[in-house]
Amino acid sequence: MSTNEVGKALGTGVVIEAVESMTGAESIAPDHMGRGARPSTQYVPDVAHASHALQREVENFLYRQAALLDAKRWQDWTGLFADDGVYWVPVAPEQTDWLGEPSIFAEDRLLMEVRMGRLTHPNAWSQAAAWGTNHLVGNVVIEAVDGDTVRTYSRFQVMELRRDTVRHFGGSYRHTLRRGADGSFRIALQRVDLMNGQAAYDYVIQAWL
């Protein structure tokens, strides 16, 4: 009689116990949830009740910011930040503060100016090769409105072409926008959570995403 036939006749449990007693092996129930699985840290945004006009204003601001990066208009892009504005790319999504934590980027206006100087320096040979980016921004959500401050969430995809090499970056933006005296928004905080932030790269990320 085959093992399958024995299993049908005696029941699978009996056969397993018999095999265990003969071999000394111990069966382990399958873990369908994944033995090493961790709970998801994917951020889920809140949704505030905002006017259609404010929604469109926020969307257009984010689209323009992305367009300035693609055009390499660094001065105009950094000009979107408040004097105390911060650009932050954390290493891990569970990080809550850019101070005292390892980060991919953690730059105030002064450090942005330093990076811009490196990107535009005539002897920056890493920038001599033809390269460019293309941003796609969507799923824009207004999370909260508090006076002149608006918190937003959005998703992005970036394609970077450098010579013959294409790299893709994806993730989410979280902006804290503050309306200035002239009525326009300035960025108090831009948080960039990279989906592939811990991936291995042949060379470092040199410009803002």
PLM-predicted stretches and their roles:
Residues 2-6, 11-14, 32, 147-153, ...:
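Short beta-strand edge/turn micro-motifs at domain boundaries
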Residues 2-6, 10-75, 79-83:
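Short, low-complexity N-terminal intrinsically disordered segments enriched in polar/charged residues
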Residues 59-60, 133-135, 170:
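Short solvent-exposed loop/turn micro-motifs enriched in small/polar/acidic residues
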Residues 65, 77, 112, 152, ...:
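Hydrophobic pocket/interface hotspot
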Residues 83-153:
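A solvent-exposed, acidic/Ser-Thr-rich amphipathic alpha-helical stretch
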Residues 100, 164-166:
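Short, solvent-exposed loop/turn segments at secondary-structure boundaries
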Residues 160:
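Catalytic core of tubulin tyrosine ligase-like
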Residues 206-209:
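Short hydrophobic/aromatic patches at helix-to-coil boundaries
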